[in-house]
């Protein structure tokens, strides 16, 4: 089994420098390191292979959870990002129609009310 490993010879030194027109600090890194990469066709030890497989499985499970989410007709529109949870355009027109009907009935009702001096325009 082939293995690939990488190791840094020295560390990166970073320091904040105040420069630029906005006066914001900039991070600069001094690159005095070399990266060494090794490749060998020798078989890895079984314990190391099992640990590596477990780590890669854990990383895959942690990042793939959103991709494995179940979205179908049984869930309707929960979590699908549709506005107001409307899966059908007809539902939007029904909501708009009911709102318009109630608003028009309220407007007609309030136009028939008599305003007197005591209410001061604050009548229900």
UniProtKB/Swiss-Prot annotation:
<keyword id="KW-0793">Thylakoid</keyword>
<dbReference type="Pfam" id="PF07123">
    <property type="entry name" value="PsbW"/>
</dbReference>
<keyword id="KW-0472">Membrane</keyword>
<comment type="similarity">
    <text>Belongs to the psbW family.</text>
</comment>
<dbReference type="InterPro" id="IPR009806">
    <property type="entry name" value="PSII_PsbW_class2"/>
</dbReference>
<feature type="transit peptide" description="Chloroplast">
    <location>
        <begin position="1"/>
        <end position="36"/>
    </location>
</feature>
<comment type="subunit">
    <text>Part of the photosystem II complex. PSII is composed of 1 copy each of membrane proteins PsbA, PsbB, PsbC, PsbD, numerous small proteins, at least 3 peripheral proteins of the oxygen-evolving complex and a large number of cofactors. It forms dimeric complexes.</text>
</comment>
<feature type="transmembrane region" description="Helical">
    <location>
        <begin position="90"/>
        <end position="110"/>
    </location>
</feature>
<keyword id="KW-0602">Photosynthesis</keyword>
<dbReference type="GO" id="GO:0042549">
    <property type="term" value="P:photosystem II stabilization"/>
</dbReference>
<dbReference type="GO" id="GO:0009535">
    <property type="term" value="C:chloroplast thylakoid membrane"/>
</dbReference>
<feature type="transit peptide" description="Thylakoid">
    <location>
        <begin position="37"/>
        <end position="72"/>
    </location>
</feature>
<keyword id="KW-0150">Chloroplast</keyword>
<feature type="topological domain" description="Stromal">
    <location>
        <begin position="111"/>
        <end position="124"/>
    </location>
</feature>
<keyword id="KW-0809">Transit peptide</keyword>
<keyword id="KW-0934">Plastid</keyword>
<dbReference type="GO" id="GO:0015979">
    <property type="term" value="P:photosynthesis"/>
</dbReference>
<keyword id="KW-1133">Transmembrane helix</keyword>
<protein>
    <recommendedName>
        <fullName>Photosystem II reaction center W protein, chloroplastic</fullName>
    </recommendedName>
</protein>
<comment type="function">
    <text>Stabilizes dimeric photosystem II (PSII). In its absence no dimeric PSII accumulates and there is a reduction of monomeric PSII.</text>
</comment>
<feature type="topological domain" description="Lumenal, thylakoid">
    <location>
        <begin position="73"/>
        <end position="89"/>
    </location>
</feature>
<keyword id="KW-0812">Transmembrane</keyword>
<keyword id="KW-0604">Photosystem II</keyword>
<dbReference type="GO" id="GO:0009523">
    <property type="term" value="C:photosystem II"/>
</dbReference>
């Amino acid at each position: 089994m082939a293995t690939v490993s990488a190791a840094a010879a020295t560390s990166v030194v970073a320091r904040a420098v105040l420069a630029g027109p906005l006066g914001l600090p900039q991070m600069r890194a001094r690159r005095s390191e070399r990266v060494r990469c090794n490749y060998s066709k020798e078989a890895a030890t079984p314990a190391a292979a099992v640990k590596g497989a477990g780590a890669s499985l854990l990383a895959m499970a942690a990042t793939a959870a959103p991709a494995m989410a179940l979205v179908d007709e049984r869930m309707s529109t929960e979590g699908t990002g549709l506005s107001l949870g409307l899966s059908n355009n007809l539902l939007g027109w029904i909501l708009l129609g009911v709102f318009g009907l109630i608003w028009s009935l309220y407007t007609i009702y309030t136009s028939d009310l008599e305003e007197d001096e005591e209410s001061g325009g604050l009548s229900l």
